[in-house]
């Protein structure tokens, strides 16, 4: 019997690998078109020069690259836009100008201050089977697919949080209605043992994992700089990863996300999280943990209010703290309305971008890059997929105890992408504002971005009684509520 089961598992594994090759092949770059590939505000083409060492060692930009080939949009003196779009006003372009030389690895170790760079609607569906992705999606070392090596190095340096298994049990809720809030597949999985807690988040934790990814990369930029690449400052990277260990002692562990979700967001253990609940957890956990890092969340509206933002970023009226802006929104009913394609793509081209969590039917991904499509007016968005179950990331009081395999499990060089028309409209968008100059550049960017705006910045928060607000705000972008039943975002 055991051999039969093992044989069936092998057949299933290889069968799924074949399906992956047919239906979800590794994306390749067109060297003739050589369209720029973007990763969180940095632009890459095949002309981008880079000196690559072996994996795990430093990857350093050549001097030819630093000035004009690998650059955030601000360094090109232009507002991020799609190639067919018209340029915005000269004032907006000027507002985005900044230093053209990326920090050296040594400078990246200093407290980061970068002036030109950084920083619902959910109904539990049947869970997406994580084994489809986890058995094959990232096991093989991919070739470069014609992509700029500097782009792949940047992509690989983004922190990637995934499903984990074998961690300390997360107790089940004693509320009799808790099981009804889970997806049907999760109810089947947990039916056999109603008493045991959750030792894996496979099938329900993908939105939490993409939220962790967004937060981790924000902290990475604050601590090590946007130009940090794998192999640089390994001790600092281990310290950062320890904050996200799968253990209640780690401040950003899945245990603490679930605990806050249960206490403040009405989310039971084992229940999927939506973008709004994830934003509230990030806000609470980060503000309780970090001394010089703040989180500003817009709630369920796309409006950013300058007076409220400054109360978070500069509470004493003098010292500006790096601040993560979280915007939970919905840009359509079943699919993203095409009027938002340009502006949503441009958010990933902004130098303050720290990515998008959510945004795929029946699952959540962490989107970090974009490339214009050759076939139409849309774009392909590059993402990190959390649906890949790995052993739990342990907690160590001494981060030096993390092994290379522990660190490697939080990175991947394998690209995944989807067309923007395939995205789910429910998402969490993040921007990291490092200082006041960065804040003013970001305001100008979102004001002049191409396409229908998905973000509005106003001076005063009407809830404070200092202004009447914008009556049209509610009509401009559909809002997000975790209790709305139109959109499926599952783990």
UniProtKB/Swiss-Prot annotation:
Location of region: Disordered: 53-137, 457-491
Reactions this protein catalyses: [protein]-C-terminal L-amino acid-glycyl-phosphatidylethanolamide + H2O = [protein]-C-terminal L-amino acid-glycine + a 1,2-diacyl-sn-glycero-3-phosphoethanolamine
Outcome following mutation: residue 206 to A: Abolishes the proteolytic activity and decreases autophagy
Biological-process GO terms, alphabetical: aggrephagy; autophagosome assembly; mitophagy; piecemeal microautophagy of the nucleus; protein processing; protein transport
GO molecular function: cysteine-type endopeptidase activity; protein-phosphatidylethanolamide deconjugating activity
Its EC number(s): 3.4.22.-
Signal peptide interval: none
Biased composition annotated in UniProt, kind: Low complexity: 126-135
Inducing factors: Expressed throughout growth and development.
Biased composition range(s): Polar residues: 61-72
Keyword Cytoplasm annotated: yes
Keywords: Autophagy, Cytoplasm, Hydrolase, Nucleus, Protease, Protein transport, Thiol protease, Transport, Ubl conjugation pathway
GO cellular component terms given for this protein: nucleus; phagophore assembly site
Main subcellular location of this protein, as a coarse class: cytoplasm
Active site as annotated: 206, 385, 387
Compartments where located: Cytoplasm; Nucleus; Preautophagosomal structure
Pfam families reported in the protein's UniProt record: Peptidase_C54 (PF03416)
Residue stretches of biased makeup (Acidic residues): 475-491
Keyword Nucleus: yes
Top enzyme class: hydrolase
Quaternary structure and interacting proteins, as annotated: Interacts with ATG8.
Function: Cysteine protease that plays a key role in cytoplasm to vacuole transport (Cvt) and autophagy by mediating both proteolytic activation and delipidation of ATG8. Required for selective autophagic degradation of the nucleus (nucleophagy) as well as for mitophagy which contributes to regulate mitochondrial quantity and quality by eliminating the mitochondria to a basal level to fulfill cellular energy requirements and preventing excess ROS production. The protease activity is required for proteolytic activation of ATG8: cleaves the C-terminal amino acid of ATG8 to reveal a C-terminal glycine.
Family to which the UniProt record says this protein belongs: Belongs to the peptidase C54 family.
Protein name in the entry: Cysteine protease ATG4
Organism: Pyricularia oryzae (strain 70-15 / ATCC MYA-4617 / FGSC 8958)
Gene giving rise to this polypeptide: ATG4
């Amino acid at each position: 019997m055991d051999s039969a089961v093992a044989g069936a598992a092998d057949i299933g594994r290889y069968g799924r690998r074949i399906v992956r090759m047919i239906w979800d092949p590794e994306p390749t770059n067109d060297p003739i078109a050589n369209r720029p590939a973007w990763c969180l505000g940095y632009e890459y083409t095949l002309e981008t020069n880079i000196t690559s060492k072996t994996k795990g060692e430093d990857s350093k930009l050549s001097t030819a690259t630093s000035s004009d080939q690998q650059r955030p949009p601000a360094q090109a003196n232009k507002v991020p836009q799609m190639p067919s779009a018209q340029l915005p006003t000269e004032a907006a372009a000027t507002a985005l100008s900044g230093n053209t030389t990326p920090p050296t690895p040594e400078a990246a170790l200093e407290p980061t201050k970068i002036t030109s760079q950084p920083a619902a609607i959910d109904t539990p569906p049947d869970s997406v089977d994580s084994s489809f992705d986890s058995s094959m999606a990232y096991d093989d070392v991919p070739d470069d697919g014609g992509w700029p090596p500097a782009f792949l190095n940047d992509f690989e340096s983004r922190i990637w949080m995934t499903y984990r298994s074998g961690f300390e049990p997360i107790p089940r809720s004693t509320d009799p209605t808790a099981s009804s809030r889970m997806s049907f597949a999760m109810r089947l999985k947990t039916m056999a043992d109603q008493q045991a807690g959750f030792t894996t988040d496979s099938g329900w934790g993908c939105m939490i994992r993409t939220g962790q990814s967004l937060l981790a990369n924000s902290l990475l930029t604050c601590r090590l700089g946007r130009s940090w690449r794998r192999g640089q400052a390994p001790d600092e990277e281990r310290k950062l990863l320890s904050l996200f260990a799968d253990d209640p002692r780690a401040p950003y562990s899945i245990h603490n996300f679930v605990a806050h979700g249960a206490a403040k967001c009405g989310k039971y253990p084992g229940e999927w999280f939506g973008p709004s609940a994830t934003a509230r957890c990030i806000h609470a956990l980060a503000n309780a943990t970090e001394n010089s890092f703040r989180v500003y969340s817009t709630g369920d509206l796309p409006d950013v209010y300058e007076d409220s933002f400054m109360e978070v970023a500069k509470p004493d009226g003098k010292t500006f703290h790096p601040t993560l802006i979280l915007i939970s929104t919905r840009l359509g009913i079943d699919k993203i309305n095409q009027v938002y394609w340009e502006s949503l793509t441009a958010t990933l081209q902004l130098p303050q971008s720290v990515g998008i969590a959510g945004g795929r039917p029946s699952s959540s991904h962490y989107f970090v890059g974009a490339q214009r499509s050759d076939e139409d007016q849309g774009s392909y968005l590059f993402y990190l997929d959390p649906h890949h179950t790995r052993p739990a990331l342990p907690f160590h009081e001494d981060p030096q105890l993390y092994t290379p395999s522990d660190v490697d499990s939080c990175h991947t060089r394998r690209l995944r992408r989807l067309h923007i028309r395939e995205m789910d409209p429910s998402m969490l968008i993040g921007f990291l504002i490092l200082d006041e100059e960065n804040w003013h550049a970001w305001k100008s960017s979102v004001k002049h971005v191409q396409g229908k705006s998905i973000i509005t910045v106003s001076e005063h928060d009407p809830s404070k009684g200092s202004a009447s607000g914008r009556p049209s705000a509610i009509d401009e972008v559909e809002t997000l509520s975790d209790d709305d039943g139109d959109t499926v975002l599952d783990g």
